[in-house]
Amino acid sequence: MEDKRNAESASLGASSGGDSKRARVAARPVSLEDVAEFQKEAIFRAMETYRREKETLEKQLETQGEKERELEERVVRLGTWWDKVADRLALVVGKYEFEKSKVKTEDVKKEEDTERDAGDEDEVEVAPGPTGLATDLELEEKSASISSHFSTLLDLIGDKISKQDKTEVSRLSAGYTDMAEQRHLLVRKIQDLEHEAQTMKNQYLAAAKKLDRYKSPTVKLIEGEDVEEKAEENGDQKTAQMEEKKETEDSPDTKDTGDTKALRETIQVQEEQMKELDAKIAALEHEASLFNAKMADLSESDLLDHSGAFKAAKEQLSDKTGQILALEKSRDAISAEKMALDENRQQYRSTIKREFEKRESELRSQLSRAETDLVRIRTARDEILADLSQKKATEADKLKTIESLKELGEVYKLRIGTLESEVQRWRKEGNEGVNMSSNVEGKSLEELKKEVTVLTLTNQSLMAEIPGMEAAFVSAQKMAENKALDVADRESRLTKLLAEKAKADEKYFAAMRHKDALGAENAKLKAQMVKSSELVNQLQEVDAKTRAKIDVLEKTLSEYVSLHAKQQEAAKRLTSQVAEKTHMLNGAQKYLTTLKEEMKQQGTKLSVGEHRARKLALDNAKLTKQIELSSFGGSSDEIDELRSIAMCSLCSKNWKDTALKVCGHVFCHQCAQDRLDARLRKCPNCNKPFSQNDLLTVHL
């Protein structure tokens, strides 16, 4: 900023001529007090420059603050409006998607419910904290949501948009583009004018600084000019009273130089240009503010009066709204019909389910009875098969016994025949009466022949008996052997049967133990099945109750949705009314702010005028005193006067080393600190308030 001012002051000095900074020969030697006074005045001029810049920056800051507040209000209003639009779009799009989602099957619905329940158990919802303005992430999410809703809505009603609607929309877009271009041109023009005004303001500040330097009495003293000329240049030339004083006090020696006149003319020209530019800027800003206000707050009546396309679009919007309402009514009717069909379907399913369960229980009881009969039949079959096998074994034994008895009968027959032949032989021997003796020597030949004959017959009979006896012996031996083999076979079979019986007993006991375990397990399973059936019945009852509650909640939700839509419409009307009242209130507040600023400016001008009048009165008194002293010719008194100017005006004992930033008056640090400690926080010269931060240390 300092470099910019230096450059502008240098350029202004170059334009006003190089003679303004020509070195002059001092009328008298310059003392240290003159140098100190020159430094003080240089610091005071710098402080005046800073004060002007501070006032300008404060005004700019106030203007920018007002613009920022207006922009924040507009941003909040637009954000609220977009939230309402997003909610309305979400409501409309959600209704259509709800109609589509009702076409799902029952199985898919169950799967989705299961997945949703599982997802709800894993989810942890985090409620976002409230914020003032929306962040970039929230704006992106809102933009994505609105874009998706718009795309869905356009897909739903895209086929119903006619060509005429599209042409009207294109016309509106073209008109909006033209207005945006005009606004852009006006903004560029305002920026150029602001830049030009800033340049002129910088030149004005540089010229004011230059003028303050030329008005400095110390500079004129160093450059060889009189004190009277210095006092006259410090007066306010715009006040008629001070002009009269100047006319009475002016002399040929106190007239302005040519450089000062040229500089004043340049400053006057620049001030006139600044006033013209300020007037143009104010007019353009007023026009731009009116244009922006009109663009931001275009009412429907203005659009309907000046835009046929908007009127047609409004009518089409009302038609589409009516169609949407009709579709919503038809959707509600279809939803009610679908709910009735769902109830009928649920009742039919419950009836079928009850019949199925009843039939299933009957079949299960029949199956259990059939299984019991099957077990009983299998047990009887096993018993019959065992009896049959025993009877078959008994019959086989009987057959073998019969065969052996038959063989024994044949042996008996042979034995009987043999015995009969023996009996016949013995009978014959008895009939013949021949006595056989062992003494052969005393017998005759006939007796011997008879004995031989008898012996021969006996021998023959014995020989005839021997085959029968042999056959009987052989058969008896065979029967004995067969009997022995049969006994051995029976013993072996008995051993095998005993072993098999032991194995069968083990298997039987193992089977019985397994049967007991299976019976216990079966009892447990039956108990579990009973509990499961009870749980299933309870779950079915809970499901029926839940479905009834869901139906009631859906009906309540539909009622709440309709009520919410009505409340949204009412809220929309209230919002429009609030927006109108807010607009009126903002206008009144702006007007009130303008009046306050004007009052503040008038008060500032009045205080500046009073300060300037007091300063001129003090300068007049000082000059009068200097003239009186100069008439007596006391240079020491002049030095004392300069010393009194450099001393603090409050205590008159300390040098001025502390300046106040708010007004530029200089005092000693002790007096300024004493006034702050005593809570007298106003400048004793101009009564402007100051604080600890407004103290500026000055080094002379």
Swiss-Prot record:
<keyword id="KW-0863">Zinc-finger</keyword>
<feature type="region of interest" description="Disordered">
    <location>
        <begin position="102"/>
        <end position="131"/>
    </location>
</feature>
<keyword id="KW-0862">Zinc</keyword>
<dbReference type="GO" id="GO:0006325">
    <property type="term" value="P:chromatin organization"/>
</dbReference>
<feature type="compositionally biased region" description="Low complexity">
    <location>
        <begin position="8"/>
        <end position="18"/>
    </location>
</feature>
<dbReference type="InterPro" id="IPR001841">
    <property type="entry name" value="Znf_RING"/>
</dbReference>
<keyword id="KW-0156">Chromatin regulator</keyword>
<feature type="coiled-coil region">
    <location>
        <begin position="178"/>
        <end position="383"/>
    </location>
</feature>
<keyword id="KW-0808">Transferase</keyword>
<dbReference type="GO" id="GO:0016567">
    <property type="term" value="P:protein ubiquitination"/>
</dbReference>
<feature type="compositionally biased region" description="Basic and acidic residues">
    <location>
        <begin position="102"/>
        <end position="117"/>
    </location>
</feature>
<comment type="function">
    <text>E3 ubiquitin-protein ligase that mediates monoubiquitination of histone H2B to form H2BK123ub1. H2BK123ub1 gives a specific tag for epigenetic transcriptional activation and is also a prerequisite for H3K4me and H3K79me formation.</text>
</comment>
<keyword id="KW-0175">Coiled coil</keyword>
<dbReference type="Pfam" id="PF13920">
    <property type="entry name" value="zf-C3HC4_3"/>
</dbReference>
<protein>
    <recommendedName>
        <fullName>E3 ubiquitin-protein ligase BRE1</fullName>
        <ecNumber>2.3.2.27</ecNumber>
    </recommendedName>
</protein>
<dbReference type="InterPro" id="IPR013083">
    <property type="entry name" value="Znf_RING/FYVE/PHD"/>
</dbReference>
<dbReference type="GO" id="GO:0061630">
    <property type="term" value="F:ubiquitin protein ligase activity"/>
</dbReference>
<feature type="coiled-coil region">
    <location>
        <begin position="39"/>
        <end position="78"/>
    </location>
</feature>
<feature type="region of interest" description="Disordered">
    <location>
        <begin position="224"/>
        <end position="261"/>
    </location>
</feature>
<dbReference type="GO" id="GO:0033503">
    <property type="term" value="C:HULC complex"/>
</dbReference>
<feature type="region of interest" description="Disordered">
    <location>
        <begin position="1"/>
        <end position="28"/>
    </location>
</feature>
<keyword id="KW-0539">Nucleus</keyword>
<dbReference type="InterPro" id="IPR013956">
    <property type="entry name" value="E3_ubiquit_lig_Bre1"/>
</dbReference>
<keyword id="KW-0833">Ubl conjugation pathway</keyword>
<dbReference type="InterPro" id="IPR017907">
    <property type="entry name" value="Znf_RING_CS"/>
</dbReference>
<comment type="pathway">
    <text>Protein modification; protein ubiquitination.</text>
</comment>
<dbReference type="Pfam" id="PF08647">
    <property type="entry name" value="BRE1"/>
</dbReference>
<dbReference type="InterPro" id="IPR013087">
    <property type="entry name" value="Znf_C2H2_type"/>
</dbReference>
<keyword id="KW-0479">Metal-binding</keyword>
<dbReference type="GO" id="GO:0005634">
    <property type="term" value="C:nucleus"/>
</dbReference>
<dbReference type="GO" id="GO:0008270">
    <property type="term" value="F:zinc ion binding"/>
</dbReference>
<feature type="zinc finger region" description="RING-type">
    <location>
        <begin position="648"/>
        <end position="687"/>
    </location>
</feature>
<comment type="similarity">
    <text>Belongs to the BRE1 family.</text>
</comment>
<feature type="compositionally biased region" description="Basic and acidic residues">
    <location>
        <begin position="232"/>
        <end position="261"/>
    </location>
</feature>
